[in-house]
């Protein structure tokens, strides 16, 4: 025990332990300083984060406030030691133990003081940071209070709208906080002043119409103060810059839910590989800044009755003007908009976006991009109308509210029952497949008009000159109205020579033919010329009748009719329109139509008087003829028609409207008369080879003496001529018979056989009535036969002869066709051509045979007339003579004639068959000869080759 106590109390051991403690003190100090550095570094990091938040929250610090200046210069301790600067690396000062212990107090006391100083420095930095945060909060509250005071002051002074307020997202300096105009390649749009009703889908639908969108973001409010503002901002990033520029240009200043949009460029954002998909359909309320047009970006939304209850009550907003929907004047553009609306309702927003991407730059789809145009308003109304179940022809016409808070929508009126011509005029505004919208039609400049007039003055029938003038017209198709006006004026001048007029007509034909070219507004030429061609033909009619030379008149007639036929072949106009132009050109002067130049005031006074006098005389003659045959009734019926219907008929039939009601009625009567006359000419050409005993002079009836009806335009009830006009019934019956004879058309042989049986029944019935009907009908028929002015042939005899001839011709043609097919001919066109030639030959043979038999028939008719006269005298003396003898003699004569015709037809048929056999034999012999020659030629070649 004593030894141990000595060991513990040994002075050397105490000295060693003291030295050890001195060595441990610097180590302990270093460890404490490292702990202090570890404590300070998180606070420095946290302070940097708060400074960044201060920048984001737009906190401004007064640079003159030195009290808040942090201790960044470093502090010196009482003993002169310096503390390193904030944020710099700490390097502790190390002094050896002997130097550190020199001239100083007790070591334990100094260590405690240093530790206290370090603890005081640590708490001081934290306190400074907390105080700095408190001061920043006070500054923020003071700024918000000043802003509220300024708002109250402005509201007291002037009643400014919410659009005059500066958004909270602007700095006090006036610069948008998130705008970045430095990068010209950014596609990110910064949208300010959005309503609280707007969400991401709304922005995607609204801005998606301009192009594919990469991302949409709305900065939703977080604090109660931000929520009280009821508006916020957002970002819309497009996939390309061009779409963003278009959206910025079109949507700038647009009012959305009563908030005016302010759009600028934002910072560049990352673009994904694929754009956002199309959103589901919804509803929007957008209108332009003026408040006159409401704009829908969503096109396939459900009906308005599907809107939630909070928006179901549509209340009219005061001081908001009504929105009037105007239907586009261009029928083609209207049709495109209607079709687009129907397809968008089926395909949704994706279909509309696809059309907008492909149709960008196409004038036909400008209504999708011009949100303030009346075409876009019509498009939006069409979408809503179709969604409500309306159709293209019927819709709601009373005003209604489509969106809560907007004005009333006034739909366009329902289309009236308009004539097709009115539709043509409205469709005439369409030009070359492109919409002209509502811009006014262009006109030629003075130099262009003078150039075109010089071309027309020097125009001849040379192709180069006509081609040059036609090229000028197409190059200036935008001024089609003035070009047509100049051409029409030049074609209706009375002083123009015939070759020049014909050349100008050829120019009109070339322009109309090229109106389908892919030139803007070129198609307007056809529509505008359609309105002026009737007047041009009226002028050509005056020119045609004023020509004295027969050859010149015939050449003019041939040229004009060729042009009209070419138009008919090109299907440029309807057949009725072409027929009207042709009838106008060929109309004679005795139809009561005043000449074109007399109506326009171009004719001299003497000529006018002469024309008026001739017209009055012709009117008297035509009135007498009309009273005789019922034309006056038709004319009177037309005179009672309204003027609008007469104009419609004239436009449809290519007739001029000049001269008023009387002239239009006269032109319509002349047109119908010309159509009937053309029908007679066609029938005469078909029947002149079949009726050898009848010529045009025998069966011709004056066209002006026939009843006129307008069955082509409107079916009218027939006029009973016998009840209205005292005409003897036998003459009327004879006229009807002759008309029947004249209107025989070639039909099928099966129909002819049916007709034959019917006619035989009628014949037996008529013979029975003759036998039992009394004397009055017989004497009337005999009087008709005795009258040389009315040449009537027995109807049954003519019908039987005609049917027999046609039957034999058909049989011969069938046999001839079979013979051609047996010969190996397979070309159907060649067979038809030969059959047609053979038909003409057979008809010509029948005509010559009929002409040979004609004198015999005339002698028989004269004998029958003499016998009828003798029979009449004998009947006056002796009434007891029986009528069956007359019928028997008629039947005998008819049977004799039928036998003759039968034998003659049989002989002719046999003769034709012999001819065909001979021709066949000749052709076969020729073929054999050709074959023999070819074989001999081959043999010769072989022999030469062998040699």
UniProtKB/Swiss-Prot annotation:
Positions of the RRM domain: 187-268
Keywords per UniProt: mRNA processing, mRNA splicing, RNA-binding
Segments of skewed composition (Basic and acidic residues): 1-11, 66-84, 104-155, 854-876, 888-916, 924-947
The organism's place on the tree of life at top rank: Eukaryota
Stored SMART domains: cwf21, RPR, RRM, SWAP
Entry keyword annotation includes RNA-binding: yes
Residue windows of the SURP motif repeats: 336-379
Molecular-function annotations in GO: RNA binding
SAP domain boundaries: 638-672
Tissue: Expressed in leaves, inflorescence stems, roots, flower buds, open flowers and siliques.
A single BP term in Gene Ontology: mRNA processing
Renumbered residue ranges of the record's region Disordered: 1-35, 63-167, 412-434, 752-797, 846-947
Composition skew (Basic residues), residue ranges: 12-34
Gene Ontology CC: nucleus
Gene disruption phenotype: No photomorphogenic phenotype.
Sequence ranges assigned to domain CID in this UniProt record: 444-589
Protein's job: Probable SR-like splicing factor.
Protein name, UniProt field: Protein RRC1-like
Species this chain originates from: Arabidopsis thaliana
């Amino acid at each position: 025990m004593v030894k141990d106590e000595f060991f513990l109390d040994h002075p050397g051991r105490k000295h060693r332990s003291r030295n050890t403690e001195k060595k441990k003190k610097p180590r302990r100090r270093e460890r404490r300083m490292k702990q202090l550095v570890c404590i300070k570094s998180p606070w420095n990091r946290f302070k940097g984060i708060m400074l960044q938040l201060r920048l984001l929250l737009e906190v401004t610090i007064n640079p003159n406030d030195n009290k808040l200046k942090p201790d960044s210069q470093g502090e010196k301790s009482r003993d002169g030691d310096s503390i390193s600067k904030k944020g710099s690396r700490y390097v502790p000062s190390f002094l050896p133990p002997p130097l550190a212990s020199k001239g100083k107090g007790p070591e334990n006391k100094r260590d405690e003081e240093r530790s206290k100083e370090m603890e005081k420095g640590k708490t001081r930095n934290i306190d400074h940071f907390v105080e700095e945060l408190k001061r920043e909060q006070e500054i923020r509250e003071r700024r918000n209070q000043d802003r509220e005071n300024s708002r109250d002051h402005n509201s007291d002074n002037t009643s400014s709208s919410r659009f005059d307020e500066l958004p909270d997202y602007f700095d006090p300096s006036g610069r948008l906080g998130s705008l970045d105009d430095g990068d010209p390649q950014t596609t990110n749009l910064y949208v300010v002043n959005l309503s609280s009703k707007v969400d991401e889908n709304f922005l995607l639908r609204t801005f998606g119409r301009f192009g594919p969108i990469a991302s949409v973001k709305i900065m939703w409010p977080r604090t109660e103060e931000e929520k009280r503002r009821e508006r916020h901002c957002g970002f819309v990033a497009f996939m390309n810059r061009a779409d963003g520029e278009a959206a910025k240009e079109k949507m700038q200043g647009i009012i959305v839910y009563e908030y005016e949009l302010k759009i600028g460029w934002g910072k560049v954002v990352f673009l994904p590989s694929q754009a956002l998909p199309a959103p589901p359909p919804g509803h929007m309320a957008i209108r332009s800044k003026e408040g006159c047009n409401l704009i829908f970006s969503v096109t396939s939304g459900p009906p308005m009755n599907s809107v939630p209850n909070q928006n179901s009550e549509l209340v009219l907003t005061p001081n908001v003007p009504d929105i009037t929907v105007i239907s586009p004047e261009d029928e083609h553009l209207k049709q495109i908009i209607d079709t687009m609306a129907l397809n968008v309702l089926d395909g949704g927003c994706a279909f509309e976006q696809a059309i907008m991407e492909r149709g960008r730059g196409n004038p036909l789809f400008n209504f999708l991009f011009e949100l303030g145009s009346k075409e876009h308003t019509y498009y939006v109304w069409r979408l809503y109308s179709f969604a409500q179940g309306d159709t293209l022809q019927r819709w709601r016409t009373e005003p209604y509210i489509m969106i809560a808070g907007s004005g009333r929508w006034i739909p366009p009126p329902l289309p009236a029952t308009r004539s097709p011509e009115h539709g043509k005029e409205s469709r005439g505004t369409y030009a070359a497949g492109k919409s002209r919208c509502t811009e006014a039609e262009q006109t030629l400049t003075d130099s262009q008009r003078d150039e075109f007039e010089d071309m027309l003055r020097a125009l001849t029938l040379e192709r180069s000159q006509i081609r040059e003038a036609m090229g000028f017209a197409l190059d200036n198709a935008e001024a089609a109205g003035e070009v047509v006006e100049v051409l029409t004026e030049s074609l209706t001048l009375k002083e123009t020579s015939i070759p020049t007029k014909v050349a100008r007509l050829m120019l009109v034909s070339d322009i109309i033919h090229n109106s389908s070219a892919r030139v803007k507004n070129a198609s307007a030429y056809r529509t505008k010329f359609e309105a002026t061609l009737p007047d041009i033909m009226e002028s050509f009619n005056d020119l045609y009748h004023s020509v004295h030379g027969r050859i010149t008149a015939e050449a003019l007639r041939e040229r004009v009719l060729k042009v009209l036929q070419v138009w008919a072949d090109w299907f440029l106009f309807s057949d009725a329109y072409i027929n009207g132009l042709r009838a106008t050109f060929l109309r004679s002067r005795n139809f009561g139509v005043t000449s074109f130049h007399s109506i326009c005031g171009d004719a001299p006074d003497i000529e006018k008087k002469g024309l008026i006098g001739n017209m009055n005389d012709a009117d008297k003659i035509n009135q007498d003829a009309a009273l005789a045959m019922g034309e006056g009734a038709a004319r009177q019926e037309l005179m009672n028609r309204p003027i609008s219907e007469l104009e419609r008929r004239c436009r449809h039939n290519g007739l001029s409207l000049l001269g008023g009601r009387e002239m239009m009625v006269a032109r319509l009567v002349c047109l119908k008369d010309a159509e009937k006359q053309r029908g007679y000419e066609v029938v005469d050409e078909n029947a002149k080879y079949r009726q050898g005993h009848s010529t045009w002079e025998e069966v011709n009836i004056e066209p002006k003496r026939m009843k006129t009806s307008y069955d082509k335009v409107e079916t009218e009830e027939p006029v009973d001529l016998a009840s209205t006009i005292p005409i003897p019934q036998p003459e009327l019956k004879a006229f009807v018979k002759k008309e029947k004879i004249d209107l025989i058309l070639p039909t099928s042989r099966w129909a002819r056989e049916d007709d034959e049986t019917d006619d035989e029944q009628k014949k037996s019935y008529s013979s029975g009535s003759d036998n039992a009907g009394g004397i009055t009908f017989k004497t009337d028929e005999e009087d008709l036969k005795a009258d040389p002015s009315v040449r009537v042939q027995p109807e049954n005899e003519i019908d039987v002869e005609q049917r027999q001839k046609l039957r034999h011709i058909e049989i011969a043609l069938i046999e001839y066709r079979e013979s051609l097919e047996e010969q190996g001919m397979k070309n159907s066109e060649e067979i038809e051509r030969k059959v047609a030639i053979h038909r003409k030959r057979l008809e010509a043979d029948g005509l010559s045979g009929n002409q040979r038999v004609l004198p015999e028939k005339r002698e028989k008719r004269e004998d029958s007339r003499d016998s009828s006269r003798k029979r009449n005298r004998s009947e006056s003396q002796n009434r007891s003579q029986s009528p069956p003898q007359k019928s028997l003699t008629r039947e005998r004569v008819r049977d004799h004639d039928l036998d003759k015709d039968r034998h003659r037809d049989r002989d002719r048929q046999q003769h034709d068959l012999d001819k065909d056999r001979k021709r066949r034999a000749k052709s076969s012999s020729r073929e054999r000869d050709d074959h023999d020659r070819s074989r001999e030629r081959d043999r010769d070649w072989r022999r030469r080759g062998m040699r």
